[in-house]
Amino acid sequence: MALVSGALSTNRLRNYCVFGAVQPFDNCRAYGSPCSPDSTNNDGWFICDYHSSIRFKIEKMVLPIPDAEGNIYNRTVGKSLVNHKTLGAARVLIPTRDNYKTVLNLNSMSLAEQLVTHMIYDNVEAQGAVCKALQHNENFQTETYRLAEDMFNRTSAILAMTNPRRYCSQVNSNYARIWTTDDVNVAGNVFESMPPFLKNLINVAVAPEQIMIDEKTLVIRNCPTCNIDDSGLVANVQLYNPVVPRYRSTFNENVLHVENVLKFKGNANALQKSLSRYEPYPIVVPLMLGTQTLNTSSAYKQFTVPTRDDFAALNQRTGAAAAAPPAPAAAPAGPRPAAELEYDETLDRFARWRAR
């Protein structure tokens, strides 16, 4: 009978969304998470499709890349929800530390959502301001503090997974991205100044125009659909994008709207409905920018673990060397292979450790 560790089953994350722990700081009613069903899937985004849509105007898609034998390498790509008529700051998808409060309209969020957003942008001062505001609640000591602490700990655990400096981080590091080819490199500098969570989000949401694998280059697209500038990740190319957001409401029914929209009218012949039998080409705006280089070799250092026979041979060699008379000097030998030197060094270190 196989034994299964209890920690592996009880501590498994059931929600990989950074907003998954958000709940009102009022314990009077039960609260269900608004996260979309994909929050249970560890797809590397660490934010569900719902929150990615309403906060960063991006929905998830997959980019299947087939090879010569029919095998498919799947890569995620974000779908822009920015309409072609949108102008100005409303075209910013992922803002920077300098403008995220205005772009994300932070004042319209609840205190719990504000706290998570400040944690994403690593704004410690703003996090403290939210905690001070919570202290005015009469139930702060008995209930509110416990809820805030639980939400903070769960959100911190998700954010830690996106930090490449963390031990055993889940962020993929076997690739390199080049965002721009100009000498100024504004896109690269802005990207490096982003917090770890947003750097990972941009990496998984923005697919490359070109993918370099060993000596092969796959040209997926020959022009970008977005850009990274001083305001963040921006859908700067005004492509026709009539997409309807799956989760966001685009208008308020209580407010009168006057629209000037494009409309097609005509019979089946005029609209060429007979062509609907063919495979449709979707009019969407995938986020694509720069070049990605995939490293096919392992990023971890390879080494050989010594066996029991190796240690026995080492003991015999050590005892024979101590009993034998000194040998005459031999001619200098050629350089030994690096793998052999590393293997012998491992055995010697183990022998010194045993002799202590």
From Swiss-Prot:
Keywords: Capsid protein, Late protein, Virion
Keyword field contains Acyltransferase: no
Pfam families in the record: Baculo_VP39 (PF04501)
Subcellular locations according to the entry: Virion
GO cellular component: viral capsid
InterPro entries: Baculo_VP39 (IPR007589)
GO MF terms, alphabetically ordered: structural molecule activity
RNA-binding is among the record's keywords: no
Family: Belongs to the baculoviridae p39 family.
Other remarks in the entry: Expressed late in infection.
Name of this chain's protein: Major capsid protein
Organism of this sequence: Lymantria dispar multicapsid nuclear polyhedrosis virus (LdMNPV)
Name of encoding gene: P39
